[in-house]
Structure formats: structure tokens, C-alpha cells
Amino acid sequence: MAHKKAGGSTRNGRDSEAKRLGVKRFGGETVLAGSIIVRQRGTKFHAGNNVGCGRDHTLFAKADGKVKFEVKGPNNRKYISIVAE
């Protein structure tokens, strides 16, 4: 009869669930107020005109309009604004 000695246990084999971060509405897309534009950790993108920032740094539309991405300021920060149509 074949015998195999018991293998040891392992401390690997688990991983966290993906958080589905990233841009949800791209430049030029029409959005309604309340639409999530970006889910992010920290402020990779900053809130511009008609855009709010949630407590987890999620950016969302405060008004209906088109999404506009812009880079401005001395630090070349990325801002997201909503331009009314």
C-alpha cells in the first residue's frame, strides 16, 4: 500500500477582494447629478466645478452636464469638472 506522510499547513492562500476603483465616466460623457465619476484612494483627481468629493474621495456630479478633465495649477493637478450643456 502506498503511503504519503501528511503535508504541513501553509500560511498563504488568501487575497483581498478587488475594490473596483477607477474612472467610471470619461471626458465628454453626459452625466446626471449624483453620478459617480471616479472611485479612488486619495485624491489622484481633484473636484472642480459642479463636482463633489465623498468621504472616501469618490468624485460625483453635483449637476447635469458633460464631464471635463483638466490639468491646472502650479502642481499640474488633475481636476474634473462638469460643464452645463
Curated annotation (Swiss-Prot):
GO BP annotations listed: translation
Domain of life assignment: Bacteria
Database matches in InterPro entries: Ribosomal_bL27, Ribosomal_bL27_CS
Keywords for the protein's UniProt record, in alphabetical order: Ribonucleoprotein, Ribosomal protein
Keyword Phosphoprotein: no
Coiled-coil regions, chain positions: none
Residues covered by region (Disordered): 1-20
A GO term for molecular function: structural constituent of ribosome
Any one annotated GO CC term: cytosolic large ribosomal subunit
Keyword Ribonucleoprotein among record annotations: yes
Family to which this protein belongs: Belongs to the bacterial ribosomal protein bL27 family.
Listed HAMAP family: Ribosomal_bL27
Annotated NCBIfam families: L27 (TIGR00062)
The protein's name: Large ribosomal subunit protein bL27
Recorded name of the encoding gene: rpmA
